[in-house]
Amino acid sequence: MEDKESIAQAADILRRGGLLAIPTETVYGLGADGLDETAVLHIFEAKGRPQDNPLILHIPDASWLTRYCEDVPDAAYKLAERFWPGPLTMILKKKPCVPLRTTGGLETVGMRCPDHAVTRAIIEASGVPVAAPSANTSGRPSCTTAEHVREDMWGKIDGIVDGGPCQVGVESTIIDLTVTPPQLLRPGGLPLESLRDALGEVTVDKAVTQKMNDGEKPRAPGMKYRHYAPKAPVTVVTGGAKASARYLLTHAGEKSGIICFDEFAQLFDGHIVHPLGASDDKRAQAQHVFDALRTFDETSVGEIWAQCPDSKGLGLAIGNRLKKAAGFHVEDADDGKIVIGITGGTGAGKTSLLRALERKGACVLDCDAVYHEMLKDDELLLRALREAFGDVIFRQDGSVDVHAIGLIVFKDRKKLAELDAIVHERIPRALAQKMAATNAEIIGLDAIKLIESGLGAICDATVAVTAPEEVRVKRIMARDSITEEYARSRIAAQKDADYFRAQCDYEFVNDLPTAEKAEHAAEVYINTIINNLKEETER
C-alpha cells in the first residue's frame, strides 16, 4: 500500500473519525485521531480496553512534539535523534489540546514515531496524531500480522493496512521523561541498555517485574492490567536455558502446551510445541512471542509452560510479556545442579569418566537402565510399543521381551527408527524427574544416543569419549567374550568418532593402557570441566 491514492484513503478514514489498523515495526496498532474524543472512545470500545489505560500518540517526526507537548526536554530530542523512527515511546507533559480520554486521565502523554514508512506517510497525510494501542482485543496477545488483526477486530473497525509481519514483534519501550532520573515504564523493542547508553541513569519501575497493586494508576500502557494472555493459563519458568528446559520436562503435563527455545523442541515430542527461537537469539524470540501465545488458542491445551530468556537486551521485554501473560505466575528453575552428558561408541571407555563423576559425589543416570525400568510400568511407553510392534514383544506375564524387540529392529532400519522415536519421546521426562529428585549437585548422563535423543541439549556440558578402533575392538572382545569379527561389526553399526567429536563440547580420548591410568586422567578431566562450568556460572 505505497501508492498515494491508498495512503490518501487511509488518511481520510482517520480524519473522518474512523478506526484503522496500521502496521508498525513493533506490532499492529488500532489507530484513530488522538485529538477526537469520540474516535478515541471507539478505540476503547473496539478493544474492550479499560478507560484508565492510556494511549500513545504516533507522529511522523520529532517536529510534531511541540504541537502536543509542553516543556519538551533536551533529552527527548536527543533520544529522537538517536532512536526515531523506532520502537521508543517518550512520556512528556501534554498540552490542553490532547484530551484526557486519550491519556487515561493523565496530564502526560506518550509520543512515538514508528519505523514504518507507509504508516508515517498515512499519519503525515491525515494531519493528526494517531492514537494507536495494539490492535488486539484487550488482554489478548498483541497482533504481529494483519491476519491476527482480522481475528480480533473484523467487523469492529473501518480498515486494515496490511504491512506484512512486524519486524520487532514486541511493543515499544516506554520511558518517562517527566521524572528525574528518567524511568523505564515498559520494556520493549529498544533495550534498556541503549537508553542508559544515551542518557546515563535510567531507573526501572517496579511494574516491569511485578504486578501493580489494586488502585494504582498506570502511567503508561501495559503496566497495570493482565496483558498478552492466551485462553489457557500460563506458567513462566526463569533460570538458565538448560535448567528451565529440565524444569519443563519435569513439571509439564502430558497435554501441556510448550513454549521453548529451538534447541529443546525435540524433547517435547508428543506435546503441542511452539519454538520461541534459539536461546541466544532474542530478536527471533521477540518476533515469535505473541504468535506463540496466540497459537495455543487454536488448540485444546489446558495449560502452557514457557521458557523465559534472561533480562539482558530484548530479554527484559520478552520476559515482561510472558510474565504478564502468566499473571506473574513465575517459577525459578535454577537449582545449582550441573549436568554432564557422557557419550561415545561401544568400547570407547566411558566407564572411566562415569567412575570419576561418582567419586565427585555425582548421581550417574544410565539411560539404558532407566529405559529398562520404564518397560516395567510406563503405560504410555508400553502402549506405544504394542501399537508399533504388536503382541509378539510381550511375554505371557505381560512383561516386555527386549530380545524380541531386538530381533525386529536390528533387521529393519525403519523399525529401529520407530523404536528410537518412541523411546526418545518418553525417556527425557523420566530422566528429568530423576534429576529433580536427587540431592546431588552434579549429575552424569550415560547415553550412547545422547545427541540423537535431544538429551544433550539439557546438559551443561557434553563429553565425547573416543578411542582408536583397535583399542575398542580389544576392549569389547575381552568384556563381552566375542569374536573380533563381531566386535568390529558392532563398532561399524554405530556412529563414528568424528560424529561424537563434532556434536559434543569436549572430547576425552581414552587410549590409556591401564584402567588405573585411564581413571586418573578421567578424574583430572572431569575436574577441569566442572571448574569451567562453575566459572561460566559466576560470569
Describe the predicted segments one by one.
Residues 348:
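ATP-binding Walker
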Residues 372-439:
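ATP-dependent small-molecule kinase phosphotransfer cores
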